């Protein structure tokens, strides 16, 4: 917290004390006493203003699946943990709640979100939908669930960052392309920023995946963080 002292209070007090020098001591004592109280109140008001201007908080909720839950990784090496480090290095007052669960679907996220919003986050990062597609669920259901989550977060006065995904082409070109495009459509319709593809710069590099060829290794998570950071940074309060 930075305290700014313009010197106005002390200068004003000295001026009044000099002006009161010719007044009786009893009257002068009352005036100076009142002035000192007023100066103290002005100082407290300045402290409150300064604290508000220089120490804004960013409370971030991450609602995702295994890609955000450090699946197969050492604790603290996933992109969400790296985000906390990035925020600290940027001197941004922040806190992160990682509510990501491996295997989570958009339906599960929608069910859990109301309770999570009771924490009154400033920003909600939604990284869901991939497990819906891997299970071959109807795209309309995924879109409906994501839209409901965005709406709920916005109604709670939170800013939203939507994180898009792609799925392997073996699910059929039509399905995979429609799945990918639904994120951009939703972001445009709901007026929220979009990270087009969380695994951009990773998906075409087999060496950056674990043995299951689905989950990235630790070395890929700084890239994932950079992908998210480009959309998140404009939402942060400095």
Predicted regions and their residues:
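Bacterial N-terminal signal peptides
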Residues: 28, 38-49
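N-terminal secretory signal peptides that target proteins for export/translocation
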Residues: 1-33
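Short glycine-rich loop/turn motifs that provide flexible caps or phosphate-binding loops at active sites
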Residues: 42-45, 63, 71, 75, ...
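Alpha-helical cap/lid subdomain in secreted, periplasmic
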Residues: 5, 82-85, 92, 108-238
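Serine-esterase "nucleophile elbow" of acetyl-processing enzymes
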Residues: 54-102, 112-120
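Acidic-and-aromatic substrate-binding clefts and catalytic sites of carbohydrate-active enzymes
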Residues: 103-107
């Amino acid at each position: 917290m930075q305290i700014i002292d313009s010197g106005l209070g002390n200068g004003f007090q000295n001026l009044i004390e000099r002006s009161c020098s010719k007044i009786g001591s009893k009257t002068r004592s009352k005036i100076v006493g009142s002035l000192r109280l007023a100066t103290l109140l002005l100082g407290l008001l300045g402290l409150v203003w300064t604290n508000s201007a220089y120490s804004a908080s960013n409370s971030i909720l991450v609602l995702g699946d295994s890609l955000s839950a450090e699946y197969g990784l050492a604790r603290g090496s996933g992109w969400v943990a790296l985000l906390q480090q990035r925020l600290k290095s940027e001197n941004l007052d922040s806190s992160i709640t990682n509510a990501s669960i491996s295997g989570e679907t958009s339906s599960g996220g929608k069910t859990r979100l109301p309770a999570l919003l009771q924490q009154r986050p400033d920003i909600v990062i939604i990284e869901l939908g991939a497990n819906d597609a891997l299970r071959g669920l109807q795209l309309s259901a995924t879109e409906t669930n994501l839209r409901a989550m965005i709406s709920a977060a916005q109604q709670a006065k939170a800013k939203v960052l939507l994180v898009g995904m792609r799925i392997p082409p073996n699910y059929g070109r039509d399905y995979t392309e429609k799945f990918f495009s639904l994120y951009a459509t939703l972001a445009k319709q709901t007026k929220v920023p979009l990270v087009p593809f969380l695994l951009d710069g990773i998906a075409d590099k087999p060496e950056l995946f674990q043995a299951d060829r689905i989950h990235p290794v630790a070395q890929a998570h700084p890239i994932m963080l950079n992908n998210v950071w480009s959309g998140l940074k404009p939402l942060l309060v400095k």
